[in-house]
Amino acid sequence: MSARSGYVGIMDKNFVVMSVSGVSIEGDDALPVVMLREDRDHGEGALSVTVGPFEASAILLELEGISPPRPLTHDLLADLFREAGMELERAEIFGLPDEGPRARLVYRRGLSRRIKEVRPSDALALALRLKAPICADRDLLSRKDSPSVLLRPQTVHLAPGSLEFP
C-alpha cells in the first residue's frame, strides 16, 4: 500500500512501484508470506516475500490501521525517522531471482540522500508506516503467464478485521 503511488523519485528504470496485497500462511509450520502486486492499473507482476511471524504481525497491524497499546519496533523507528527530520523516499526490493529478495531503504535528511540495506520485512513494515513507495526490481516479479504460487497461493489469507487486541 504505497501512499504516493506515482512517485518514486530518482530510481533505476528496472524498478516498479508495488502494493502490499495481503499476508498469507501456507500451512501449520510455514512462515508468513507478504504478497506484493504491481501498483499500475494493469500491472501483472507479483512478488512474495517470506517474513517472520512478528514482522507479519507488524505489517498486518499497519495494513488494518490498528495501533497496539504500546508502539512496536517499526512504530518506534518511524517515530525516530520523523523526529530526526528524515524522509523515507522508498523501500526497494531487489536481488537475484534464485537467491531470494533483499531490500534497502533510500532516505534523506535535508539534501543528504542515504541508502541502507535492511531485511525485506523491515523495509516493508517501515515503508507502510511512513507512507513511502515500495519498489521492486522487475527481474524478481512473476507474471500471470508463468506458473507460480505467488499469484494463486493455496493459503489461509488473513483478512482485514481478523486481528484484535484485548
Segments predicted by a language model, with ranges:
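Divalent-cation
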Residues: 4-166
